Amino acid sequence: MSKVCEFELNGKQEIFEFEKVAKQSNGAVLAKIGNAVVLATVVSEFDNPVSEDFTPLTVQYIEKTYAAAKLPGGFIKREGKPSDFETLTSRVIDRSLRPLFPKGYVYPTTITVMVLSADKNVDLQTLSLNAANAALYTSNLPIKKSVCGVRVGKIENTLVINPTNEQLENSTLDLYVAGSKEELLMIEMKTISSSELVEIDIEAFTKIHNTNEMDEDALVEAIAFAQNALKEANLTYEKAFEEVSKEKFEVELVKFTIEESVINYVRDNFSNDIKEAIKKLAKSERATQLKDVAKMISKNEYCISNEIEFNTIYEAVSVVKREIVRAMIVNERVRADGRGLKDVRPISIETNILPSTHSSCLFTRGETQALVIGTIAGPKDGQMYEVLTDKSTSMENFMVHYNFPGFSVGEAKPMFGVGRRELGHGNLAKKALEATIDKDYNETVRLVSEILESNGSSSMATVCGGSLALKAAGIPISDLVAGVAMGMVVENDKYAILTDIMGLEDHDGDMDFKVAGTSKGITALQMDIKLGGIELSVLKEALLQAKEGRTHILSLMKDAEKDIVPSGALPLIEQFAIDPSKIMVVIGKAGATIKEIIEKFTVSIDLDKENGTVKVSGGNKQNIIDACEHIKTISNNAPSKKDASKNIDFEKLYSEDEVVIGKVERLADFGAFILLPKGGEGLLHISKISKDRVKNVADVLSIGQELEVKVLKVKKDRIELSSAN
C-alpha cells in the first residue's frame, strides 16, 4: 500500500507518494506539483564495491516527450541522446547530492529521475532535485540528511522563491541554491538583461539595455534569502519523510588508509623533495613530478626491506604534499608558485590571430590558455532545440562551446564527444556573457573555446577570451566580462581565500567557486563547497576579494581592446527598412525574386515580415550595396497595400486597346500584376503574355521589368491586359 506525504511549501502544494511504483529499487518516489509528475529512483549495489577511493555515483535526468503530449522531434520517434538541459540538470543533481555520501562509500549507485508529466508553470529542475533527495533520504542507504534546491528570482526588485517559468521571464536574476538545513553545498547564479533602456548613444546609433549586474551585498542578501527557504524546506521534508523512511542498511565504509609509519617516514625524510615537486606542480596539472619522487623513495633501503609497494609510497607522498600545500597557504600565506593569496598569474592577450575567422582571442593566464573563436551567422542559423513544455521549436542564437583536449594537461588521449564537464563549463561561460549582448542584436553568434593548456580556471579563461572575441567581432556588448576562479583552505579555526587558483589548489582546497562579471558587478557565479558549509560573512569576503581580481583582469582586457584590428573575414552587414506590405514582393513567387538577388549578388538576406527590416550580408561590400539598391528599387516600384486598396475608377483612366508602358509588380501562377502609369494595377493573364504557350510566368517576366501592355477590358474596379507584342 502506498504512503503519501502532502504539504504546502512556498505557496505550492507538494505531494510525494512512496511504495507505489519501482518497488525493486532501494528508494523511489512519485513527486507531484500541479500537473508535473516526476519519478525518482535510487539503486545501490551493496554486493559489488569498487576498489578505488571515490564515490561511484551516477545521476540521470530524463525528460519523456509523452510528458507534454508530444512525439520526439526528428526522424526517429524515440528518445535518444540526452539534450543539453537534461545533461546539465543531471550535473546539478549530482553536485548537490554527492556530498551526502559518507567517505568510504564505494558501492555503485544510480539515481534516475524521469519526468512523466510536465507543467509549464513548474520548475522541473528544482522538482527533480527535491524528488531525488526524497528517494535518497527515505531509501535504505546510509544517508541521514535532506538536501533540496530552491530557485530565487528578482522581479521588480523583490526576491521571489521558486518563481514560475512565466515569472522567471520577467526576472533580472536566476539564482539556484542547494543545501541542507544547516549548510550551503552548491550555488549557480546568472543575471538576466532586461528591455529597460539605461542609455542611448546617438552618435553610435546604439541602445544600451540594463544588464542587471549584481553587487556583492545584493548577491549575499539573495543567497541568505535562499538559505532561509532551504532551512524551512529541509525541516519540512525531514519531518514529513520520517515515517516513510526505510531502515538504513549497515554497509561497510571502506577506509583507504596508509600506514602512519610510511607517511611519517616520507614526511620526515623527503619533505624538501616534495616541496621541490610542488613548485613544478604549480606549473602543470601533470602528476609526473610526484611520481618521480615516489620512484626515488621506493629505491630507498627502508622501502625495499619493508616491501612497501609503489602505490603505497605514492599515496603517502600525495598525503604529505597536501599537508605542505595547505600549511604554506594557511600559516605562511604563500602559495606553491610563490604568489600571495590575492595575486593573479601573469596574463597575455592577443586578438584576431586567425585571419580566416570572424574573430579570435588567445587568452593566457599562467599555464592556462584558451583560444576563443567567434563566428557570426544570420538569425535563422541558430541551434534549434525543443523545450518539453513548449509546443513549438525554440532557437538558440548565442552558443558557447568549450573543448578540453587531452593535450591541454599532457595526456595522450583522443578527442571524442562532449562530456558533462565540457557542457557545464561552456554553459557557465554563456551565462557570464549573454547578459551583456544587446537584446536587439538578433544575429547568431557561436563562440568556441579551445583549451590549449590547463592549470586551473579554464572556464574563466573562456569567459575572458570570449568577451574579447565578441568585441573583436563587432558584436554590441554593454561591457567586457572577466572571470576568476577562487578557492579556500580551512584548517581548524584558520582559513585563507585564494584568487585565481591553479589545479593543485583546486585539488587540495576546500572550496571552488568561479565569479564572472563586468566593472559594474557580477553576471554569473558557480560554487561547490567541499567542507560542508560556509558562513555568509566569509562568502562576502571571498566575493569582495574576487572583485579585486576581476578588476585587475578587466584593466588588462581593456588595454587589449584598444589594439583590436577587425578581421578581414568579418561579414559586412547593411540594414534598412521598407514597407512591411512590400516584403512579399521582394520575396516573389515561391521565393523566386529573393533567390535571384542572392545568386546574382552573392549575399545573404534576412527579411522581417512584421517590421519590414531588410538585412543584407556578405563578403564583398560593393555587392552588398548593389543588392540593397536592387531591393529598394523593387520596393519603391511596388505599391503598398494602402495604395492598392484605393478605389480607382479604371474607366475614367484607361480605354480599351490603349497601349501603355507598365512595370511588373508581382507574379502569380495565373499571370502577372502590372503597375500602370496612371495608377492602379492590371492583370496580365498567363495566356496573354505571349503567342507561344507559357508554362511558368517567372520564366518570361521578372519583378520590376518594364513592358508594353494593351488594355483588353476595362471595368470600373479592374482592368485586364495583354502583351502589346
From Swiss-Prot:
Domain KH: 571-631
Keyword list, A-Z: Cytoplasm, Magnesium, Metal-binding, Nucleotidyltransferase, RNA-binding, Transferase
Binding locations of Mg(2+): D506, D512
GO biological process: mRNA catabolic process; RNA processing
EC number assigned by the record: 2.7.7.8
Pfam families: KH_1, PNPase, RNase_PH, RNase_PH_C, S1
Stretches assigned to the S1 motif domain: 657-724
Cofactor section: Mg(2+)
Compartments in which it is found: Cytoplasm
SUPFAM superfamilies hit by this protein: Eukaryotic type KH-domain (KH-domain type I), Nucleic acid-binding proteins, Ribonuclease PH domain 2-like, Ribosomal protein S5 domain 2-like
CDD domains: KH-I_PNPase (cd02393), RNase_PH_PNPase_2 (cd11364)
Molecular function as annotated in GO: 3'-5'-RNA exonuclease activity; magnesium ion binding; polyribonucleotide nucleotidyltransferase activity; RNA binding
GO cellular component annotations of the record: cytosol
Reactions mediated catalytically: RNA(n+1) + phosphate = RNA(n) + a ribonucleoside 5'-diphosphate
Main location: cytoplasm
Top-rank lineage group of the source organism: Bacteria
InterPro entries named in the record: ExoRNase_PH_dom1 (IPR001247), ExoRNase_PH_dom2 (IPR015847), ExoRNase_PH_dom2_sf (IPR036345), KH_dom (IPR004087), KH_dom_type_1 (IPR004088), KH_dom_type_1_sf (IPR036612), NA-bd_OB-fold (IPR012340), PNPase (IPR012162)
Entries under HAMAP family matching the protein: PNPase (MF_01595)
Family to which the UniProt record says this protein belongs: Belongs to the polyribonucleotide nucleotidyltransferase family.
Function of the protein: Involved in mRNA degradation. Catalyzes the phosphorolysis of single-stranded polyribonucleotides processively in the 3'- to 5'-direction.
Name by which UniProt lists this protein: Polyribonucleotide nucleotidyltransferase
Organism: Aliarcobacter butzleri (strain RM4018)
Gene: pnp
